[in-house]
């Protein structure tokens, strides 16, 4: 039996979908434990591309049980669209189950997200406007609607009526915009209740029993550590916790049940939305990496900001989640660059610092301290053994290990499952 947690160790978009899909072959259960449809996981199977936002990436493996845990906020409209899209492409989705305790994204959450972001003006966060933040806000305020509430034919209408009355007052009096019609929302979400009810499970019991029976369980995270509500670049963060600890909270299992934490990192760094980014490349090279890496958001389509690998943030993420090893993705994107830079620390007020600062004001004044590495010209997209990588690529990877103090278990050199170099079997 082995339990592995997948964590993004940068600002999200690290390639967690591909790695989850790759590791799902040896797992029996795949659990999404936080976030919502603000996630965008791209998986390629036999040249067919699948883009998933809510459903675990393991769904593309027949016979694997896929679970949406209580830490995830669910937009049933998006869930239905994903299920329908997968079914149209011949993917069986009857192996999906949803936690009774997951909170539901309502139409007023999506509208609140958009209105509040607009009100911020120049201080905008860069939200996806999917209603994620307002749903977590209602959860913390104890007025949210859970799956178990949605499928309760007596309770749901009462909860919805109270919430719509409250939200409409805010929309109309504070934001001078129209609210929602109770009957319309009720009818729509009663339909979603019928869809969700057969999938509903006590996920904590299900996952606990699976671990007890010796099954391999893979916990799939969304976003990245630097977007964590507590440990990220606040306030430019998400509303959940993309860290290893959240796998326990978001699925209902104890921390002693987790065996390994795998951090996913690109061979460079990207970020979507606002906020500081010390190694960002605002030049033609950044555009070249964006083009070669196809760096556009799966969820929003927004171009990602690109920069050099930052060992400071990855070492920070490793400490926060207790990472056992790393999976390096998109190493192939760096092929052809004459020089590759790696950030080993920051220069702040004339001194070199190695730890990630909490203050964004301080972070904005930090200058990256770079180490230069000669690049490689070889096409590495079909390399399957570490020994066959160019020497310069191996030296670059070895330095990443030294600076982050975390070993490498997997290296991805392309989007396909076959384009993966295995250094260690994570389920042994």
Curated annotation (Swiss-Prot):
Localization (cell): Cytoplasm
Keywords: Cytoplasm, GTP-binding, Ligase, Magnesium, Metal-binding, Nucleotide-binding, Purine biosynthesis
Record-level GO cellular component terms: cytoplasm
Swiss-Prot/TrEMBL cofactor(s): Mg(2+)
Binding positions (Mg(2+)): 13, 40
Gene Ontology molecular function terms on file: adenylosuccinate synthase activity; GTP binding; magnesium ion binding
Location of the active site: 13 (proton acceptor), 41 (proton donor)
SUPFAM superfamilies in the cross-refs: P-loop containing nucleoside triphosphate hydrolases (SSF52540)
Gene3D superfamilies given in the database record: Adenylosuccinate Synthetase, subunit A, domain 1, Adenylosuccinate Synthetase, subunit A, domain 2, Adenylosuccinate Synthetase, subunit A, domain 3
E.C. numbers: 6.3.4.4
Annotated positions binding IMP: 13-16, 38-41, 128, 142, 223, 238, 302
Chain residues that bind GTP: 12-18, 40-42, 304, 330-332, 412-414
Pfam families: Adenylsucc_synt
TM annotation in the entry: none
Binding annotation for substrate: 298-304
Sections of the chain in a coiled coil: none
Cofactor remark: Binds 1 Mg(2+) ion per subunit.
First and last residue of the signal peptide: none
HAMAP family: Adenylosucc_synth
Entry-linked NCBIfam families: PRK01117.1, purA
Similarity remark: Belongs to the adenylosuccinate synthetase family.
Assembly description: Homodimer.
The protein's name in its UniProt record: Adenylosuccinate synthetase
Organism, as annotated: Desulforamulus reducens (strain ATCC BAA-1160 / DSM 100696 / MI-1)
Taxon lineage: Bacteria, Bacillati, Bacillota, Clostridia, Eubacteriales
């Amino acid at each position: 039996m082995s339990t592995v947690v997948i964590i993004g160790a940068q600002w999200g978009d690290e390639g967690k979908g591909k790695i989850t899909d790759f590791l799902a072959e040896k797992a029996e259960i795949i659990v999404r434990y936080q976030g919502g449809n603000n996630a965008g996981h791209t998986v390629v199977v036999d040249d067919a591309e699948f883009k998933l936002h809510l459903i675990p990436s393991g769904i593309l493996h027949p016979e694997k049980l896929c679970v949406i845990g209580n830490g995830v906020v669910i937009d049933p409209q998006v869930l239905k669209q994903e299920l329908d899209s997968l079914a149209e492409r011949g993917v069986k989705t009857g192996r999906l189950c949803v936690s009774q305790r997951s909170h539901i994204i309502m139409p007023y959450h999506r509208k609140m997200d958009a209105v509040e972001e607009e009100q911020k003006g120049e201080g905008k966060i860069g939200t996806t406007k999917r209603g994620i933040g307002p749903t977590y806000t209602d959860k913390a305020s104890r007025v949210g609607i859970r799956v178990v509430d949605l499928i309760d034919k007596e309770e749901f209408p009462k909860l919805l009526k109270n919430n719509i009355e409250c939200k409409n007052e805010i929309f109309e009096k504070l934001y001078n915009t129209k609210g929602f019609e109770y009957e319309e929302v009720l009818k729509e979400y009663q339909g979603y209740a019928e869809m969700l009810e057969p999938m509903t499970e006590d996920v904590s019991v299900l996952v606990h029993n699976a671990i007890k029976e010796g099954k391999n369980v893979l916990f799939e995270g969304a976003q990245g550590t630097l977007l964590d509500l507590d440990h990220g670049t606040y306030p430019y963060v998400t509303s959940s916790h993309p860290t290893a600890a959240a796998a326990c909270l978001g699925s209902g299992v104890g921390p002693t049940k987790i065996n390994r934490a795998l951090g996913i990192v690109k061979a460079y760094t990207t970020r979507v939305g606002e906020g500081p980014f010390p190694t960002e490349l605002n030049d033609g090279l950044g555009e070249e990496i964006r083009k070669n890496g196809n760096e556009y958001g799966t969820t929003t389509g927004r171009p990602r900001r690109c920069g050099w690998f930052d060992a400071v943030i990855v070492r920070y993420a490793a400490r926060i989640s207790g990472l056992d090893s790393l999976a390096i993705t998109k190493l192939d994107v760096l092929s052809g660059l004459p020089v590759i830079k790696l950030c080993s620390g920051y220069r702040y007020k004339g001194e070199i610092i190695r730890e990630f600062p909490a203050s964004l004001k301080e972070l904005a004044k930090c200058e990256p301290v770079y180490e230069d590495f000669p690049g490689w010209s070889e096409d590495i997209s079909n390399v399957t053994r570490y020994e066959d990588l160019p020497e310069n690529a191996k030296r670059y990877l070895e330095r990443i290990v030294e600076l982050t103090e975390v070993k490498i278990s997997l290296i991805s050199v392309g989007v396909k499952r076959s384009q993966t170099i295995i250094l260690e079997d994570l389920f042994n």
